[in-house]
Amino acid sequence: MLGELSTGEIENLLTSNVIGRIGCYADKKMFVVPITYVHDGEFVLGHTIEGLKIKILRENPECCFEVDVMENLSNWRSVIAWGTFEELKGDEAAKAQDKLIQTLGPLMPSET
């Protein structure tokens, strides 16, 4: 698809996917890595463990987020958003984690 997505198409793309890529920059290096996420209508919420991504985002919280859907080589859509990384604590973190579990839980492999 060539052109710009409408606001509704952007919202649909963000809410109908669970894997995107976060891009960040520190020490003259770009870092782009896939993450699982939930879009709550306003924010992109993700969860990760301590590592290079968190280290970089703490040093420079300005980041971008990208999600795409590719149906074939001539039919694909993508959204790129720019924003600021924020670590959630306490009740905010618990609410975000609940949203992640509600959305991602059914996608987890079963042991049965």
Regions found by a protein language model. Name each.
Residues 52-54, 72:
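Short, surface-exposed beta-strand-loop junctions and turns on beta-sheet-rich folds
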